[in-house]
Amino acid sequence: MPASNDPVAASRRCETVSADVAIIGAGPVGLMIANYLGLQGVRVVVLEKLEQIIDYPRAIGLDDEALRVFQSVGLADVLLPHTTPDHWMRFVTHTGHCFASIEPRTDEFGWSRRNAFIQPLADRVLYEGLRRFPHVQVLFGTSVSGFTQDPAGVTIEADDEKGGRRTVRASYMVGADGGNSFVRRLLDVPFEGRTKPNQWIVVDVRNDPIGSPHIYMHCDPQRPYVSAALPHGIRRFEFMVMPGETEEELSKPENMAALIRKVVADPQKVDYIRKRVYTHNARLASTFRVDRVLLAGDAAHIMPVWQGQGYNSGIRDASNLGWKLAMVVKQLAGDALLDTYTAERRAHARSMIHLSEVAGDIFAPTSRFGIKFRDAFVRTFNVVPAMKRYFVEMRFKPMPRYETGVVLLAERKRKHGVMARVLERSGHSAPGRLLGLMSEKRESLLGRLVYGRDPSCHSPVGRMFIQPRVRTAEGSVVRLDDVLGSRFAIIGWGSDPTFGLSPLARETWQRLGGCFVLAKPDNQLDFHDDVPAGVIAIGDVQGRLKEWFARVPESVVLLRPDRFVAGMCTPQQVSDCIGELALKLSLKPAEQPAVKLAVPERAVAPESVAGVAAVAAVATRA
């Protein structure tokens, strides 16, 4: 990765850069997309107006899906030292009573479901990961002043910090430039939603003065506040800014001491990192694509922080968009594949916004009615155990489920009956948001009442596939994705997934760079007679694959590079499913040039690890 502070490059007053994909913004989403494209051999240039990666903490929560994406680009092991797994969220009354604790203990996707992390260090891991790719360039201190599109690509005009001009020509452009996105505004894409009236002041400190693990949401009616333990001895406090207060006033030593005294006995012995006031927003772009320009992360959606889903939703965008962009720029798939990005991601981003708003309604209601609703909701926990389990086990979290796009599901229109219309009208109230969120679970009673019976609601198609530990033929026990890599995969349980495969289907799968996998009970792995050439055999160490396949009528699953289930079938139907999938992908004819999707490298170079360690030392020391 060419360095952005190269003195020769800095001396140029006018420069033209050519790339397959230009990414505006070197935040976590832009850097993640760049890593994914870098693994696929795609030429990428990242333009960032700041002179370096932001070095102050913002997001503090990382979920299992996001960690799985880090794994897909070979960076999970480098990130793990900067995370705290099993980071529970506890809701506490003003008297100190814990009335609810979100502590999911499952790991179906291979990682802890709730993790604390230090975002600047995670961003540094992503940036250092780009050193693996000479075809990926990051240009700091480069502000985009405009861009134009034509049928062949995007031309971007930018200014560097030395007063020079840069022209970037790319086939596609991704706007990952934050909530105040210049790209989105220039495209004139509506950013629909609302801004909450309350502000919050965030205070990050070193040498944790409390030390207790987890995150505590104190529902104090006088001033709600948050206390969160973070890795490397850092703690975050968040206090609601009350009407009439300002950041300047609250930042005065005596006022800050009064705030901190609520949680720390001696405010004079607190080692501050920074203080910052922010406002909660809940907004969603009307589309994530305009011709050859795509929006991702905060440029496409912003949400309140209460479930830590802003960062994670952006990483999901990167995972969904990365492999599709790679296929299109490599001329393997047609441009229509990129239309599935909005179709798949926008609905789930909206659900995560609703989830974040509901969490805010519970923790910090902004009206007397909201407080009464919250208190009534909490009281049901003690009399309705099922309600408490639903909350504690995070069953309320909307998991991505793609009903359109690159999935082999029959098209079905949602039913919008009386209940649906009632929820739409009450959607901006606390009860309306909660019920609307619960109705997204289509298999639930409320989901059926609102949207009607969905024959495919229990189907795994369109959902993320599990990631258990498996044994390889060489005897290693690894996570499933470490075997599959970032490529298409067909997994058959107990039978050869290539049996009866037509020559055309086999050729199509080879062009996709896909692999064939035979999963079997672990004790059968040493028997090789049932494993044909070109098929990867894995042992089901934990029994989770057997359990998963026992719940569905089919025994073969087609997986996308982002590990979502594209389709399910019997061994006799694999050829037909591959043909259907090719149509969903807008796969180009065989005579077109094609490049296989690569298996990710497992780790960054040693010098990159050293760079991350150095940043960690700075973050915890100064």
Curated annotation (Swiss-Prot):
The keyword Zinc does not apply. It catalyses: 3-(3-hydroxyphenyl)propanoate + NADH + O2 + H(+) = 3-(2,3-dihydroxyphenyl)propanoate + NAD(+) + H2O; (2E)-3-(3-hydroxyphenyl)prop-2-enoate + NADH + O2 + H(+) = (2E)-3-(2,3-dihydroxyphenyl)prop-2-enoate + NAD(+) + H2O. It is an enzyme of class 1 (oxidoreductase). It comes from the Bacteria. Pathway: Aromatic compound metabolism; 3-phenylpropanoate degradation. FAD binds at residues 20-49, 288-298. Pfam families: FAD_binding_3. Belongs to the PheA/TfdB FAD monooxygenase family. This is 3-(3-hydroxy-phenyl)propionate/3-hydroxycinnamic acid hydroxylase. It comes from Paraburkholderia xenovorans (strain LB400).
